[in-house]
Amino acid sequence: MGANHARIYAGMNAAKLVATADLDKDRCASIAEKYNVSTYTDYRELLEREKPDLVSIVVPTASHMAVAMDCLQAGVHVLIEKPITSTLDEAGAVIERARSEKLKLMIGHIVRFNPAVQELKKHLDAGELGRIFQIVCHREGPFPTRIRDVGVVVDLAPHDVDIMRYLSQSEPIRVYAETERRIHTEHEDLLLATMRFKNGITSALNINWLTPTKIREINVLGEKGMFQINDLTQDLYFYENSLAVNGIWDSLKTIQGVNPGKMVRFAFDRKEPLEMELTAFVEAVQNDLPVPVTGEDGYEALRIASALVQSGLTHQVIEL
């Protein structure tokens, strides 16, 4: 993942890649050769010598706090790949340090920058779905060998929890989760969860590291139909409930409920979400603008993910 950040920064006109740091000397050599930049095996040496304006922190979750604190202390604006940190206490400390230093802190919730998600948000904000009833997210695939320090909930659920908050414009009030450790014995590798939001929207998450093929879907069900996103292909579809669209929902709902209408596949420009995310970060730093995904957003995503872990362990509904 860090190599992708380097690739995108190197291709920017608005920013210049000056250096990278990695414990792996071979990766350092590869980056140095590819982009003609300085590389370090100690990020603190990079901070001292290069004095960068901003950094991406793409390290194991357990190291997020320590690296972020050192960067903020050095006066550097920070983007941290999700999750923000391993614990809420750590997240709070990082947020407070960024605030006290008057530095930008952005969290890498990359799904927000998928063009299909941004297109969906426009349609929802315009009221084209009517009342939203439910949001369902699928994030399934094989185990990523790079993940060693957290389970599937803390690693992946923040993506979908953040998107649910973003699309619903509301906060969850309670969660219930079932988690399993089927193959990876140290951490959970499967999550099936439900959540209720303040505004009445219900949601469901199906997340695992056990599926032999990647599935990334977001379904938003509402009064006038359903939007469906394939996160991998950046496709957005709308499946119409013709009764609601034609204004006869109230008179016939007790008899028919819904009736299939037209299906629309939306056309929009496809772009790399990571490029859009990093561009937004650079623009926020250069123009002193608010970052689009704040430290507080990262904190809330981690808080909800932590509640899902707790619910999975205790088999109890957790009130938030």
Feature locations, PLM:
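N-terminal Rossmann-like dinucleotide-binding module
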Residues: 1-35
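Beta-loop-alpha module in the N-terminal Rossmann-like domain of NAD(P)-dependent dehydrogenases
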Residues: 5, 35-97
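Short, Asp-centered acidic motifs that coordinate Mg2+ and/or phosphate
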Residues: 19, 53-54, 134
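C-terminal helix-rich "cap/oligomerization" subdomain common to oxidoreductases
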Residues: 54-59, 280-320
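A contiguous active-site-proximal alpha/beta segment in oxidoreductase catalytic domains
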Residues: 79, 85-147
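Oxidoreductase and adenylate-handling cofactor-binding alpha/beta cores
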Residues: 113-134, 154-180, 194-201, 311
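Contiguous beta-strand/loop segments that form the cofactor/metal-binding neighborhood of enzyme cores
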Residues: 161-241, 268-271, 275-289
